Amino acid sequence: MAASLGGMFAGQPPGPPPPPPGLPGQASLLQAAPGAPRPSNSTLVDELESSFEACFASLVSQDYVNGTDQEEIRTGVDQCIQKFLDIARQTECFFLQKRLQLSVQKPDQVIKEDVSELRSELQRKDALVQKHLTKLRHWQQVLEDINVQHKKPADMPQGSLAYLEQASANIPAPLKQT
């Protein structure tokens, strides 16, 4: 897949970039130190990082802390955020184009990924259904217990007088002395 991403950023030669020293086989997305000026052939990722850093820099800049007009601060921050969003859209568009190329060149790979995603979604939903069934069984048992408790007192007559009558009926009659 690395070969299909060759030349993915503006100014980058086709093919995978050379690995940085000390990390064989891993491509580096950042080729310049953070905060350092970007080369003229910067990539979309470099520009995205730079605009992201600029968003934060505009928020913590000493110029803004030292009493700059609020409208000026708002305008500067809005411009930084808009630049970041524009570059993020360009980056997203690039990856969507690569995804489209991959789907044309290797449709079986896309189908495998879709099947894998669907399987994981089914497993997640099955687990959710089991969780709900467990809760349902619990509440059905609670309702059944409540119904059983309400049926037992219904067998007995209601009221204190009825209770006394029932209790006295079970007492044997006193024996007559002759």
From Swiss-Prot:
Record field: compositional bias (Pro residues): 13-23
Keyword Transcription regulation set for record: yes
Coiled coil residues, start to end: 109-145
Compartments where located: Nucleus; Cytoplasm; Membrane
GO MF terms held by the record: actin binding
GO BP term (any one): negative regulation of smooth muscle cell differentiation
UniProt keyword annotation of Transit peptide present: no
Region (Disordered): 1-43
Main location: nucleus
Keywords: Actin-binding, Activator, Coiled coil, Cytoplasm, Membrane, Nucleus, Transcription, Transcription regulation
One annotated Gene Ontology cellular component of this protein: cortical actin cytoskeleton
InterPro entries recorded: Mediator_Med28
Assembly notes: Forms a ternary complex with NF2/merlin and GRB2. Binds to actin. Component of the Mediator complex, which is probably composed of MED1, MED4, MED6, MED7, MED8, MED9, MED10, MED11, MED12, MED13, MED13L, MED14, MED15, MED16, MED17, MED18, MED19, MED20, MED21, MED22, MED23, MED24, MED25, MED26, MED27, MED29, MED30, MED31, CCNC, CDK8 and CDC2L6/CDK11. The MED12, MED13, CCNC and CDK8 subunits form a distinct module termed the CDK8 module. Mediator containing the CDK8 module is less active than Mediator lacking this module in supporting transcriptional activation.
Family of this protein: Belongs to the Mediator complex subunit 28 family.
Functional summary from the UniProt entry: May be part of a complex containing NF2/merlin that participates in cellular signaling to the actin cytoskeleton downstream of tyrosine kinase signaling pathways. Component of the Mediator complex, a coactivator involved in the regulated transcription of nearly all RNA polymerase II-dependent genes. Mediator functions as a bridge to convey information from gene-specific regulatory proteins to the basal RNA polymerase II transcription machinery.
Name under which the protein is recorded: Mediator of RNA polymerase II transcription subunit 28
Originating species: Rattus norvegicus
